[in-house]
Amino acid sequence: MAKKQEYGNESIKSLKGADRVRKRPAVIFGSDGLEGCEHSVFEIMSNSIDEAREGYGNKICVTRFLDGSVEVQDFGRGIPVDYNKNEDKYNWELLFCEMYAGGKYDNGGDNYEFSLGLNGLGLCATQYASEYMDAEIHTDGYKYTLHFEKGENIGGLKKEKYDKKDTGTRIKWKPDLDVFTDINIPIEYFQETIKRQAIVNDGVKFILKNQTSASKFETFEYCYNDGIMDYVKEIAGDTAFTTPQYWECERKGKDREDLPEYKLKIKSAICFSLKNQLKEYYHNSSFLEHGGAPEKAFRSCLLYTSPSPRDYAAS
C-alpha cells in the first residue's frame, strides 16, 4: 500500500536567510552545478565592472586559487558598508545579507547609468552560497573588513582609519560544495569571460592570476583601449578587405508612454574579411550567445542602409 502523504496547513514552509539560496541555488544562479558556480563568480566580477564602467578605477584583478576559492579586487569607490539612515541599518547587512538591496534601482542613473550586475541579488546570493567570504573595503578614509561563513556573519563590521589614498573593494570567497555539486571552475572559463569583458569595456585592464602550485601563479592581462574596434581589427588581421567601421550613439527611450525614460548607448564595429567569419553581440556587456534582439536590430539596420544593386547600376 502506498504511503499516505499528509499535506495540511503545517506543510507550508518559508525559507529564511541563507537557506533561500543554499537550498535552492538554481533559482538565482540557474543551476546547482558548475554553471551555477560560474554564474556566482560572474556576479562578483560584474559589480567591479560596473564601477569601472562609471569611470571609477581602470583595473580589475581576478585570482583563481587551487582550492577553488576566487578573489576579485577593484579600485573603484568602495562598497558603502557603513550606517544607512534611510534604511536604519548598516549597508553591509543590506548588501551582503538581504536580497534585493543595492544601488542600481534608480532608473534616473544617479548611481549607475548602465549596470551589468543582478541589481541587489548577486553579492548577497554569492555570499549565501559560499563556504566563507572575506571582504575588505577602502572608502571615505577607512578600511572596513567583514567575514562570513556559510551565509552567516562572524564578528560584525570592523572599521579602522586608513591613511592611504587608494579606494576599492577586495572580495575573496570559496563556493560551497554543500550548495554546488562542483566548484572546480576551469581556467578557460575565466580567460574567455574576462577577455570578453575587456573587449566591451574600453581601456579597463583585467589581470587574471591563476595559482598553479603552492607558491606559483601564472598571470594573464587583457585590455582593449579602443574596445570592440580593436577586437575587430585583431580578428580581421591581414585578411580584411574593407576598412573597419565604427559607430556609436546615445539615445533615450521608453518601453511604454507612461513609464520613465532610460538611457541607451549603442556601439557597433564591422569589417569584412576574406577568411574569418565572426559575429558577436553583447547587452550591458553580457555576451549574447545567440545574438537575440541586438543581432536582429543590427542586421535590419545594415540591410536598410546598404545600397541596392540598382543604385550602383544607376551610377
Report the location of each language-model feature.
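Single conserved hydrophobic/aromatic residue that forms the stacking wall/gate
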Residues: 304-315
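Conserved short strand/loop->alpha-helix "switch" segment adjacent to the catalytic nucleotide/phosphoryl-transfer site
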Residues: 23-41, 113
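GHKL-type ATPase core
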Residues: 2-11, 66-91, 102-236
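Alpha-helix capping/hinge segments and adjacent helical runs
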Residues: 17-18
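Short beta-strand elements
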Residues: 264-274
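Short histidine-centered catalytic/ligand-binding loop motif
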Residues: 179, 183, 282-294
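A conserved short beta-strand within the histidine kinase catalytic ATPase domain
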Residues: 58-63
